[in-house]
Amino acid sequence: MITLGNRQFSGPFISPLWSPPRAPGLYAVMVPGWRLLMFHAVHFGHAADLSVPELIRGNPKYGYWLTLAGTEWNLYVATCEMYQSTVGEREAAYRELLVLPTTTTRGQAHAQL
């Protein structure tokens, strides 16, 4: 578990080994920080089904994330499942994540396990 904003996320999981849940919710794409077990979120998103095959690799920013991570094995995904949520509820939660303080290194938020 990892906390981003005021929400608990499962993970982070190494992207190539990640088994996405069949659930609506939020997700964060993350890269490792400079300290052990420190991660920086480089992207937040929401989806009606987190198990959509191209959720991560199909994103137009995927190449940029790989540039930051160096390899897909340094790209991590964390999810916050929101069962029985509406699109509006997921969008509101997503907007809450976007206002997190930015870090000086790579992304919008950082978290430590």
Annotate each PLM feature.
Residues V52-E72:
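A broadly used, surface-exposed interaction patch
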Residues T103-A111:
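Coupling/hinge elements of helicase-like and P-loop NTPase modules
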